[in-house]
Amino acid sequence: MPLSYQHFRKLLLLDDEAGPLEEELPRLADEGLNRRVAEDLNLGNLNVSIPWTHKVGNFTGLYSSTVPVFNPDWKTPSFPHIHLQEDIINRCQQYVGPLTVNEKRRLKLIMPARFYPNLTKYLPLDKGIKPYYPEYAVNHYFKTRHYLHTLWKAGILYKRETTRSASFCGSPYSWEQELQHGRLVFQTSTRHGDESFCSQSSGILSRSPVGPCVRSQLKQSRLGLQPQQGSLARGKSGRSGSIWSRVHPTTRRPFGVEPSGSGHIDNTASSTSSCLHQSAVRKTAYSHLSTSKRQSSSGHAVELHNIPPSSARSQSEGPIFSCWWLQFRNSKPCSDYCLTHIVNLLEDWGPCTEHGEHNIRIPRTPARVTGGVFLVDKNPHNTTESRLVVDFSQFSRGSTHVSWPKFAVPNLQSLTNLLSSNLSWLSLDVSAAFYHIPLHPAAMPHLLVGSSGLPRYVARLSSTSRNINYQHGTMQNLHDSCSRNLYVSLLLLYKTFGRKLHLYSHPIILGFRKIPMGVGLSPFLLAQFTSAICSVVRRAFPHCLAFSYMDDVVLGAKSVQHLESLFTSITNFLLSLGIHLNPNKTKRWGYSLNFMGYVIGSWGTLPQEHIVQKLKQCFRKLPVNRPIDWKVCQRIVGLLGFAAPFTQCGYPALMPLYACIQSKQAFTFSPTYKAFLCKQYLNLYPVARQRSGLCQVFADATPTGWGLAIGHRRMRGTFVAPLPIHTAELLAACFARSRSGAKLIGTDNSVVLSRKYTSFPWLLGCAANWILRGTSFVYVPSALNPADDPSRGRLGLYRPLLHLPFRPTTGRTSLYAVSPSVPSHLPDRVHFASPLHVAWRPP
């Protein structure tokens, strides 16, 4: 007969009327019993013949999470001008005195951040914007382009102008300044207009990427043409003192970007940009492509690899840099839905490209992308605004895989020890936290996003029957992209974007100037940054407990009034460092802090309400006696694992699920196992703060017997059959807890000390977790353990009782990093009377 839930509870000693623990508990370690129970609960039966279930409630397989929904009315969020102060270390030192080595090291890591992977795969521009929403392709294209444009305007992206130069907006950092003979050259325009950048004599690098003109002149003279364009390009550049035009006409092939169908990086797009000539040909030369492509009349990239002189000549005489969008103006409408109708709506469509306020030299950057982008809802509660998702997953997979640095995250017990107190709390919202941390420009070639321009994007999506030959763009191809769909979409978008439609229909390549979210390095850097800042804040304001996890910063103080005054001072301090806070999103929590998915109060820690609701929903939807795909089990275990520390039996209760995931088999919930888990998760117990104290109870065991020292009493017992040593030690610890009720137990076994009971026989692990819940362990070397003799059957010999102090752990967070001493000649900082008479120390 299958095991009933009541019987199972009794077996696990979860009921009060169980027999003496010393007899009952060792039985749970018996392998035979564990096997029988597993068979009864159908836990071991992994090879099932009925089809697997692939969806349970909201949980689907690990990689097929809910499909994002496109919202045609998404608004692009605005980004403040974020500029983290470069001398952040000095500013902190003026405020707090000398920083510790740890803080300095962390702050130097992000000033600037560096990312140089050994290998980078370059993808064609077509893959720049992911076709996530096929039915809203055009709308998604423009919204994404607008988002990228907003980021560029906010100084978060560089725009690739030529192979070796980029432009950006916002305040420059010193590593972006003029290094004339080094690798970087930087120059600021006097006026920020779009067309005003031609005649400056000082500059090294003009904002107009006229490399192509000069290069084409050299190329054509080799093809036997008159170097007619040369005079144009040289016109204004005579005055500029240091032109280093590194053009080697003989060694380099002409520039050209491969048709984007192929995914290889084109090594010929090499140093076109290094002709750094000032030029006056900017207005005529719409080199809207910030790459070294030339546009032919149809707007498709023309390759200039091996072109016979005649065609090169016709190319040079015609409108070289013609623009796909503006060409519709002169062509006959092909139908009612021809784009000509839209292009004729406006007389002035604005420039083909915009240029940043500053220019900078960069390492050779191909006209390619290294990751794709798409839009999703900003968060589950805010679906009106969009968020850009950047997929640089190439750096986490395959041959281009980078191993990211690891960083410490406080575990639940450390977090509770730190934050469970009677303080009042508030949390600060750092707006666009990732975009605070600057990236070195030399990392730009590895983090490229962009798009191939509207015609290519549309052509790629609709490339069903028509095979568009990109190499030879001709006039007839111009109308190939006209369609009712595109026409209607563009008309609607015209209301939103107006003449920007023209700008956004051009190709563009952007590199990150601040760290993007889609790279594994970013969370590490953000964690280093905020933890260093909080460490400084804790020292500057000794009455304040500041703590952070990623971009979530919380402040705690003894009274609400004090918290408010601290809030003002700390906000001003953070603003002076260039950290942008969002004052509307500051949350005041009172005495129970919501942080990292937990509610933390003076009573301890529990999961937040929305997680409790998810648990209830999960158990409501959980099918019984149906094999569930192990990928779905991963999702279920993810949720249950988060709340496991708050249940009686903890993680050991989930071991059968873990085992099936590990063996990649389906899992079938029997009614009893489901009822057991359900009951476990419906009553959650808080994880309490550990208290420091003196250890007076000790446990020890040998494979055959156990011994306890409780104060001056000694006890011993034997096991019916010899047990593995770790199991014996765990049993001894359980006996010590149940006999003495002590919350502090000394043991010499590292596995018991770690409080991870998942490797023990399943039933024993579950029961021991419940018995030892809330117990803290202290390590006692075997030689000093007073329970060592009784465990070997010797009761007469007394070892002196140790005075072993226990200090609760706060993980790797050192709350009080003492500042290095200040040299004596500095005057003392003024100390105003504090609202508290004593500096608050952690509980």
Swiss-Prot record:
Gene3D superfamilies: 3.30.70.270. One of its GO terms (biological process) is DNA replication. Residues 224-273, 288-316 are annotated as: Disordered. Residues 1-177 are annotated as: Terminal protein domain (TP). Coiled coil: none annotated. Residues 178-346 are annotated as: Spacer. The record marks 63 as: Priming of reverse-transcription by covalently linking the first nucleotide of the (-)DNA. GO terms for molecular function: DNA binding; DNA-directed DNA polymerase activity; metal ion binding; RNA-directed DNA polymerase activity; RNA-DNA hybrid ribonuclease activity. It comes from the Viruses. Its EC number is 2.7.7.7, 2.7.7.49, 3.1.26.4. Residues 357-600 form the Reverse transcriptase domain. SUPFAM superfamilies: DNA/RNA polymerases. It holds the Pfam family RVT_1. Activated by host HSP70 and HSP40 in vitro to be able to bind the epsilon loop of the pgRNA. Because deletion of the RNase H region renders the protein partly chaperone-independent, the chaperones may be needed indirectly to relieve occlusion of the RNA-binding site by this domain. Inhibited by several reverse-transcriptase inhibitors: Lamivudine, Adefovir and Entecavir. InterPro entries: DNA/RNA_pol_sf, DNApol_viral_C, DNApol_viral_N, HBV_DPOL, Rev_trsase/Diguanyl_cyclase, RT_dom, Viral_Replic_Matur_Polypro. Residues 288-299 have a biased composition (Polar residues). Hepadnaviral virions contain probably just one P protein molecule per particle. Multifunctional enzyme that converts the viral RNA genome into dsDNA in viral cytoplasmic capsids. This enzyme displays a DNA polymerase activity that can copy either DNA or RNA templates, and a ribonuclease H (RNase H) activity that cleaves the RNA strand of RNA-DNA heteroduplexes in a partially processive 3'- to 5'-endonucleasic mode. Neo-synthesized pregenomic RNA (pgRNA) are encapsidated together with the P protein, and reverse-transcribed inside the nucleocapsid. PANTHER family: PEPTIDASE A2 DOMAIN-CONTAINING PROTEIN-RELATED, POL PROTEIN. Terminal protein domain (TP) is hepadnavirus-specific. Spacer domain is highly variable and separates the TP and RT domains. Polymerase/reverse-transcriptase domain (RT) and ribonuclease H domain (RH) are similar to retrovirus reverse transcriptase/RNase H. The polymerase/reverse transcriptase (RT) and ribonuclease H (RH) domains are structured in five subdomains: finger, palm, thumb, connection and RNase H. Within the palm subdomain, the 'primer grip' region is thought to be involved in the positioning of the primer terminus for accommodating the incoming nucleotide. The RH domain stabilizes the association of RT with primer-template. Belongs to the hepadnaviridae P protein family. This is Protein P. It comes from Hepatitis B virus genotype C subtype ayr (isolate Human/Japan/Okamoto/-).
